[in-house]
Amino acid sequence: YPMIPLSSLFTNAVLRAQYLHQLAADIYKDFERTYMPNEQRHSSKNSPSAFCYSETIPAPTGKDEAQQRSDVELLQFSLALIQSWISPLQSLSRVFTNSLVFLTSDRVFEKLKDLEEGIVALMRDLGEGGFGSSTLLKLTYDKFDVNLRNDDALFKNYGLLSCFKKDMHKVETYLKVMKCRRFVESNCTL
């Protein structure tokens, strides 16, 4: 196999993370428009279902905090976040039919697996083959609930989609911070 330059690995990982974050935001908005009346949107943001597992790991919450962490730590956090979504996203297409969510859900899973492979490749290239991330976030998110006629199921899915969007934003931020730190570019904005 030809060696892929580190800059290309970072570029590919950032592009995948940006794509996943945008897709997560689109799916969240589509779900909100389709299933959540306005008055329920605000109350659900404060419900326990809006709690994200990723909030239990000591991951940076923004770019300023991310800049204080090593690349290896940021890759470990990114990998842990991605792996926590692999199982739940396998069931996403069975939950939502006849919508943007259904049309994109299989792509989300494929892109997530691609990003996981990219991060593993970055860790390998940076000499972090130990994959210590498994200790960071052993929890994985629940599967999406198929019964959309039930309010509890709607709130659960809404909360999961909100967490997925937040987590993909974190991964995107971490990868951009690392790329900007390693490869000085004139258009490097966070």
Swiss-Prot record:
SUPFAM superfamilies for the chain: 4-helical cytokines
MF term (GO), any: growth hormone receptor binding
Origin superkingdom: Eukaryota
Disulfide-bond pairs as recorded: 52-163, 180-188
Keyword terms, alphabetized: Disulfide bond, Hormone, Secreted
GO biological process: animal organ development; growth hormone receptor signaling pathway; positive regulation of growth; positive regulation of receptor signaling pathway via JAK-STAT; response to nutrient levels
UniProt-annotated location(s): Secreted
InterPro entries from the UniProt entry: 4_helix_cytokine-like_core, Somatotropin, Somatotropin/Prolactin, Somatotropin_CS
Main location: secreted
One Pfam family from the record: Hormone_1
GO CC terms: extracellular space
Family per record: Belongs to the somatotropin/prolactin family.
Biological role stated in the UniProt entry: Growth hormone plays an important role in growth control and is involved in the regulation of several anabolic processes. Implicated as an osmoregulatory substance important for seawater adaptation.
Protein name: Somatotropin-1
Organism: Acipenser gueldenstaedtii (Russian sturgeon)
